[in-house]
């Protein structure tokens, strides 16, 4: 028997079947770096319309975790897809470098500032530590395949950025938004510092819940108010609190003006409570025998005075809108030094903002004999004992509730009034303007808008001062006596900023006030406070975006971070930008959910359910991680586990195999000379290119909408259904057996070429390494990298007016599916081995029959059978299989007649009819020795 293998056009490519991503990706990265791929992209995109995604800076501390990977990969997908869409989209990664976590790390190794090192040396150590952390994280981010200006990132500790942060504060002061006050702020006794809203987390905590009686100073006045004369025992107003330790700072009792308050007689005394809460309070304190003596509106009780249960003063009843009937007694213990609501109402009534608690969380000397020097969290029992001793405690019980804790120490925090600097939300209309700006931003998902609106509407003034060593100094001078800011504050801040730009923040602490204040230096003191780190990152729209040359003065189009950043970076950026410029710093804000394990549980080292991105990249490769990120709906929680990553690897193999099939069958194809014009192509090939065109429209729309899981689903559908189970199957016969340079084969290769050109670009934003690899194997002249180009524009499709249009082939797909079912059953019944051993008769109603007949002898190639005949539906024999999908179709199968051709494997009657090629069929003889077969349709 002759060997006809050499006459076949067998697929061939150097593109490997196995990805071996973990091994290959580092080599690709090295090439990207050596070539300066990021620089090549920037040069290619110069002059295009811009799209600026401003990087929210991760904190320069510790290794990157899976959440960091999600964030950076999503950003990279957007940047690359925007590049392919014709934008110049520079990406400048950044890091947050000041603040407490770095201080704590340095303290652990070197001690607190002033112990072994001066404050200046301590800052230098912090800077050194942050730099090493940046280097470690940068390597991992690059390994993810994220393209950016990694050689020139922005760091909030860059001297120029530090200077620009000071300038941002100057602008806010110039616009009248800064004020100083002894306001209660979140205070961590372990950090010994104020905390920003975003540094507070909530955990369940068990606290004592107490009902306390404040006895009326003027008993007769109360009797008159309630219209009663006979009351058995003293009258008291009852408060309820879960923070007994704050009672030494009590300066009032808040009640609601419109609530009805009842005077209730119980055993030996009378108590005042909100009428609607009488029943629940009586149950709580264990009193079943009580009488309501009278009721009045809360407004009637305003400014009546009540004796503090153990301190030597009395306090007024005041009216507040914050009082509710949700719990308690309807009367709220008010300590202006320990709560924001209390502070606001205290200001209204001119109450003292008492703060008897020191920075370490212990009571200051002179607070109360048994409390001085005691930690507030240990003081509850002492306070409760005092109340019991004074006869003021009506009830005590334990309750579990959500309590604010320090994000760093996980320990409970307190509200503590300290002299601080604030950005005011209302004195110059910052709140109103911010709410207006929010409406002009596109929030993705859209629920983000309501979330941040609620936060802005209800947030207190922003405390921006910190009592820390490693941070950007506020750079302010205040008068020794009046504590007023220097009248030339803005000018002085610019002078400080210039020095910081040269020498870093240490320039402020080294500065002798006389150098810039001259003779006034004796009258002013330098403010020792540093800025909240959220001010550092929140001002990067000004300190970075406005000044980096690659952004060319354009504002950021997008901020993209985790959903916790509504109260973090999105908020601080909005506040600062609106306070500085009167407008939001972004046009779009996209948020992603947190990563959870396969069971939906929060990731935790203690549970052992964390997934290390480094491990995934070392085992499976970064492209698998990128594909998992893209295929997961980021608007909710993002589940990841070994099993989920394995599924991503399976999907990857399907895409890789499709790409490999395309490349292997483009062997020997030179698009410059072998391309077939669309009008001369086989109809099925034009249909396949049209499928790619339709897929591209969907994929580009999904990229534009940031629906990356939709991109992946559409890509998978294209590879698996439209190509894998239909087109690529059908063309194997023509591709392998037709004459190498025939129109039939070149038409097919032309289609594969167009499809490959489109596919490699669809993949590029997500499967960046694999797309780069595919790009290197594609035929034809091209730029060195897929990332410098744009979406492929060479796709075309069938016109609706053509007889064999898309609808025609969609119906053929269904017919093919029905035939496959019949063949599978015949194989199961051992009637045939493979589909080429079968011949089918399609009994079809006239309309469908006409379509099938139009394909002539080429129908069998579509059905992958050796024979295919069309007959009248009504002539179908009893054993013909009725289609469930196409009502006007029945399928009958028989074994194909004739012999099997060893070259094309089809069974035909003309095998051996040509003496010179006695072993092969007539079609193969034509392809081997003649002009080659002609294909028109398939």
Curated annotation (Swiss-Prot):
Catalysed conversion reaction: tRNA(Ile) + L-isoleucine + ATP = L-isoleucyl-tRNA(Ile) + AMP + diphosphate
Give the EC number(s) under which this enzyme is classified: 6.1.1.5
Q: Which UniProt keywords apply?
A: Acetylation, Aminoacyl-tRNA synthetase, ATP-binding, Cytoplasm, Ligase, Metal-binding, Nucleotide-binding, Protein biosynthesis, Zinc
Motif 'KMSKS' region: where in chain: 602-606
Binding sites annotated in the UniProt record for L-isoleucyl-5'-AMP: 561
Q: Enumerate the GO terms in the molecular function aspect.
A: aminoacyl-tRNA deacylase activity; ATP binding; isoleucine-tRNA ligase activity; tRNA binding; zinc ion binding
- Pfam families with a match to the protein in the record: Anticodon_1, tRNA-synt_1, zf-FPG_IleRS
Q: Signal peptide span per the entry?
A: none
- Where does it reside? Cytoplasm
Q: Which residues bind ATP?
A: 605
Query: Gene3D superfamilies of this UniProt entry?
Result: 1.10.730.20, HUPs, Valyl/Leucyl/Isoleucyl-tRNA synthetase, editing domain
Q: Which cofactor does it need?
A: Zn(2+)
Q: Output a single Gene Ontology CC term carried by this record.
A: cytosol
- Note the SS bond partners: none
Modified sites of kind N6-acetyllysine? 183
Cofactor note (record) = Binds 1 zinc ion per subunit.
Which HAMAP family does UniProt cross-reference here?
A: Ile_tRNA_synth_type1 (MF_02002)
General function of this protein: Catalyzes the attachment of isoleucine to tRNA(Ile). As IleRS can inadvertently accommodate and process structurally similar amino acids such as valine, to avoid such errors it has two additional distinct tRNA(Ile)-dependent editing activities. One activity is designated as 'pretransfer' editing and involves the hydrolysis of activated Val-AMP. The other activity is designated 'posttransfer' editing and involves deacylation of mischarged Val-tRNA(Ile).
* Domain comment, as recorded: IleRS has two distinct active sites: one for aminoacylation and one for editing. The misactivated valine is translocated from the active site to the editing site, which sterically excludes the correctly activated isoleucine. The single editing site contains two valyl binding pockets, one specific for each substrate (Val-AMP or Val-tRNA(Ile)).
PANTHER family (UniProt xref): ISOLEUCINE--TRNA LIGASE, MITOCHONDRIAL (PTHR42765:SF1), SOLEUCYL-TRNA SYNTHETASE (PTHR42765)
Write out the similarity annotation.
Belongs to the class-I aminoacyl-tRNA synthetase family. IleS type 1 subfamily.
Q: What is this protein called?
A: Isoleucine--tRNA ligase
Q: Which organism is it from?
A: Escherichia coli O6:H1 (strain CFT073 / ATCC 700928 / UPEC)
At the highest ranks, the source species' classification is:
Bacteria, Pseudomonadati, Pseudomonadota, Gammaproteobacteria, Enterobacterales
